[in-house]
């Protein structure tokens, strides 16, 4: 019954898994492993931590529908100065690229990816994976985006005009996402997120953000259950080993 799903070979009763999933999705800002351990009465922090990481990995479906229309794209550092970083490099900081659909004056769906650097070799594959060809990609003038001129996208470039104009004014939607993401990581997880596991947390943030207009927390729970039964199983060792490879 559970073979080929997130629940394969689990020693935890499915009823407890469902309680964990409900708690994770019913809380507006999610839940930390420490809080989940306390709520479910688990004796092991590792059990709660592994459960949450398995569920975070299930939140993102391979082959999901890509963003479309006009999409802003930019990068920012977690834990560092997010404005005007010369050369796009800060030693020891985590770099995240964000794509955000324009929805009138608001934000549509988003995608996020933890990347090692802001080169075209990292940025263009993210755009191709995340944004439908034929869409308009709106970026700043960073050279890593220049190959978009020959790709299957319309490329709109906005450059800062002097020091009085902020990057957040040129690309307001992605910078709003930067701010919300940072606040969420600090609020729910007190900023205690290891860089090698950051992508899993970004998956959860995107899952929540893209369903923020849902009137029912039950819908998030239902979607997570759907994803969990359609996701290949992952063991604790696989989670740890994949994190080591990301370092």
Give the label of every model feature segment:
Residues 1-247:
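Residue-level recognition of single "structural anchor" positions
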């Amino acid at each position: 019954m559970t073979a080929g799903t997130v629940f394969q070979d689990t020693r935890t009763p499915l009823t407890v898994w469902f309680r964990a999933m409900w708690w994770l999705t019913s809380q507006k800002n999610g839940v930390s492993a420490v809080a989940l351990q306390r709520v479910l009465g688990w004796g092991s922090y590792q059990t709660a931590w592994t459960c949450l990481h398995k569920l975070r990995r299930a939140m993102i479906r391979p082959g999901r529908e890509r963003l479309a229309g006009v999409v802003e794209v930019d990068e920012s550092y977690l834990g560092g100065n997010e404005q005007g970083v010369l050369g796009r490099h800060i030693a020891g900081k985590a770099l995240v690229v964000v794509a955000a659909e324009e929805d009138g004056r608001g934000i549509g769906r988003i995608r996020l990816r933890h990347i090692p650097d802001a080169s075209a070799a990292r940025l263009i594959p993210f755009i191709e994976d995340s944004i439908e060809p034929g869409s308009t990609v709106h970026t700043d003038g960073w050279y890593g985006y220049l190959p978009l001129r020959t790709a299957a996208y319309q490329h709109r470039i906005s450059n800062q005009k002097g020091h009085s104009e902020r990057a957040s004014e040129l690309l307001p939607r992605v910078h709003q996402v930067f701010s919300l993401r940072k606040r969420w990581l600090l609020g729910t997880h007190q900023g205690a997120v290891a860089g090698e596991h950051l992508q899993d947390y970004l998956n959860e943030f995107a899952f929540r953000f893209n369903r923020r207009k849902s009137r029912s927390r039950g819908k998030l729970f239902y979607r997570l259950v759907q994803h969990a039964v359609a996701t290949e199983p992952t063991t604790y060792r696989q989670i740890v080993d994949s994190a080591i490879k990301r370092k």
